[in-house]
């Protein structure tokens, strides 16, 4: 793209300028506030879009996006960076798990959204059209929610378009988290970006409502490594990290309301047919035994004793 002003909504950053501001746009007739940084480097280069807070209680990723936005220096950036630290602000202030309180929907299941849809669909549509489509590359930062424990991993989506897929895989490797997962989550940020020919990844680190320094660092260091990979900052290519590529992401869900007792630890290697945990009814009688559908690695576990029908229990990467 030609080097010039960087504009998103009502905010503009001139070349060599870093600007923080809040975009406002109507959602169901009421003003919706979206804070962001625009960093327009002095030297030309690609545009990187970074978002967090799609799932608003994944605090390590939000803290990392805040830190990353604060540390960026336009004088040292080649290209442009857009950072949205908390996309789902109403859910963040409500300390909500998974869903947006405006309509009860999971924002990361409705992309690319609809301008005439529900509140979450309208938010997704504005962000997709005005923020994500401005980028040459896209990163969405996540982690375990308030009731999820996980091992760090990075997801990318294979679209079948070689240029996009190769670039997304290279981004995932450059980010530096050793576990990579090839997966499509319908309605997600990263798969919607990839389908729009924007190479994209979703990085996971942290969880359970805690923002530990190592989880925040996994995200901020990953973003710094990625910028070096994209030649957006000095330092040369990042040192390669030996990665394990998983081709599937298998979720197990509860068939009942009740209590959840995991039988394995997050990160554990499991075999096909192995018992992974049990769901009991209110009396404590076993109503479901969760069995691993494949040999693989446990990537996340719901850490809440309380479980509802259709809730995720855990996921196995294969």
Regions found by a protein language model. Give the residues of each.
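Structured catalytic-domain cores with a bias toward divalent-metal coordination
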Residues: 1-318
């Amino acid at each position: 793209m030609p080097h010039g002003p960087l504009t998103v909504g009502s905010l503009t950053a001139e070349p060599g300028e870093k600007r923080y501001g809040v975009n406002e746009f109507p959602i169901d007739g009421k003003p919706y506030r979206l804070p962001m940084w625009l960093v327009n480097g002095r030297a030309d280069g690609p545009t990187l879009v970074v978002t967090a807070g799609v799932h608003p209680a994944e605090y390590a990723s939000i803290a990392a996006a805040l830190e990353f936005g604060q540390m960026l220096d336009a004088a040292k950036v080649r290209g442009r960076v857009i950072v949205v630290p908390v996309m789902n602000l109403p859910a963040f202030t409500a300390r909500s798990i998974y869903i947006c309180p405006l309509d009860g929907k999971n924002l990361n299941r409705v992309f690319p959204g609809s301008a005439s849809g529900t509140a979450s669909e309208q938010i997704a549509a504005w962000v997709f059209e005005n923020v994500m489509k401005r980028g040459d590359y896209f990163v969405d930062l996540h982690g375990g929610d308030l009731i999820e424990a996980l091992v760090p991993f990075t997801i990318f989506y294979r679209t079948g378009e070689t240029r996009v897929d190769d670039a997304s895989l290279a981004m995932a490797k450059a980010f530096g988290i050793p576990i990579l997962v090839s997966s499509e989550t319908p309605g997600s940020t990263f798969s919607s970006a990839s389908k729009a020919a924007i190479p994209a990844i979703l990085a996971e680190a942290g969880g359970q409502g805690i923002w530990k320094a190592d989880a925040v660092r996994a995200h901020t260091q990953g973003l710094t490594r990625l910028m070096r990979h994209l030649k957006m900052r000095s330092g040369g290519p990042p040192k390669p990290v030996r990665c394990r590529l998983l081709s599937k992401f298998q979720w197990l869900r509860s068939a009942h309301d009740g209590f959840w007792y995991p039988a394995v630890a997050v990160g554990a290697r499991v075999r096909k047919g192995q018992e992974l945990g049990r769901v009991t009814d209110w009396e404590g009688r076993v109503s479901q035994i969760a069995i691993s559908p494949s040999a693989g690695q446990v990537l996340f576990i719901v850490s809440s004793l309380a479980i509802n029908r259709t809730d995720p229990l855990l996921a196995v990467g294969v």
